[in-house]
Structures are given as structure tokens and as C-alpha cells.
Regions:
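C-terminal binding/interaction regions
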Residues: 2-47, 95-164
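Short, well-ordered amphipathic alpha-helical segments that serve as non-catalytic structural scaffolds
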Residues: 37, 82-90
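Short beta-strand scaffold segments in enzyme catalytic cores
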Residues: 51-60, 102
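Alpha-helix C-terminal capping segments
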Residues: 59, 89-95
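Compact, glycine-rich, soluble single-domain proteins
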Residues: 70-84
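Short amphipathic alpha-helical face segments that pack within enzyme cores
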Residues: 81, 85, 120-123
Length: 164
């Protein structure tokens, strides 16, 4: 019963857009800024085939933001998601410590629903973050968003610690 109550309280906190206590770096105002940056990144998406545009904004521990958008290709396999674009961009600049990522997306760039990361992006995130502390923010707007720990989106995950 206690576990079920905790799960319900966690869902209520998330639905209200309140942060879970494990990540002190990310306030509500920071979340809104990340969502705004993700929306701007989404506008740059190249999605001529699916018309589903996605943007992301990745926050480092040093409070620097790297944005990404999805880039499609006619062969589909070489396409890249917004989340991976942001991570690869940050890593190519020497960043290694990340706090959160905000993700938005929708058909023709219209935000109608939450846009969770695909399985490949979840696994890429897992490579570079502590899934118990890293926040994944999925948003419809700056006021309407859900916050998860990566661990909740990718339970029982395989990561670098398994092969070290």
C-alpha cells in the first residue's frame, strides 16, 4: 500500500510540474527556459518525410544549454533525433556532466501532446548520465509539462557501469 501511495504522490507532483527533490539544479523557471529553447530548436527541424518536428534543450551541470532538432533523411536510418543531436553537440564541445533535457514535438511543429524520447535516445542518454538524477522534461508548453527521471523511462537499463 505504501509503495502505491508513493507512486501516486509522485505522479501528482509530476502532473503539477513540481520537481522531484533529487535534482536541485533545475527550478521551475529553468524548466520554462529549457522548454522555450526546445521550442525554438524544434522550429529548425528538418522533417520533410514525417512532418513530425522535435526540439530539445540539454542542460549541463554548469548551466550551459545545448539545443537539438531532428534531422530526417530519405533513407530514414541516417536520421537523427533532437535529443541525440543535443547530446552529440554537447559532447563534441567537451561537456560530460548533464542535469536535464526538455523535449517538445508535434506534427508540423504543432504541440498537441507530450513527446517522450524514443528507445534509442533513452539508451544514448543512459550512456552519459546518472539515470537516478537526470531529469527528462516532456512538454506541451512552458506551463504544461511532465518531469521524469531517466530511470523511470528506462528501468533496468544497461550502461557503461556494466562493462567497466
Amino acid at each position: 500500500m505504501k509503495q502505491e501511495e508513493d507512486r501516486i504522490h509522485s505522479l501528482v507532483r509530476r502532473e503539477k510540474g513540481e520537481l522531484l527533490a533529487k535534482n536541485e539544479l533545475v527550478s521551475r523557471s529553468v524548466i520554462r527556459l529549457l522548454i522555450r529553447d526546445a521550442i525554438e530548436a524544434m522550429e529548425k527541424a528538418y522533417a520533410p518525410y514525417s512532418h513530425f518536428k522535435v526540439g530539445s534543450a540539454l542542460l549541463t551541470i554548469k548551466q550551459k544549454v545545448y539545443t537539438g532538432c531532428n534531422v530526417e533523411n530519405a533513407a530514414y536510418s541516417p536520421s537523427n533525433c533532437a535529443e541525440r543531436t543535443a547530446f552529440f553537440k554537447a559532447i563534441s564541445e567537451g561537456e560530460k556532466d548533464f542535469a536535464a533535457i526538455a523535449i517538445v514535438g508535434g506534427k508540423d511543429g504543432i504541440l498537441q501532446d507530450y513527446c517522450p524520447p524514443c528507445g534509442v535516445c533513452r539508451q544514448v542518454m543512459r550512456e552519459f548520465v546518472d539515470p537516478r538524477k537526470f531529469l527528462v522534461i516532456v512538454a506541451k508548453s512552458e506551463e504544461d509539462y511532465l518531469v521524469y527521471f531517466l530511470e523511470e523511462l528506462l528501468p533496468i537499463s544497461f550502461g557503461p557501469d556494466y562493462i567497466e
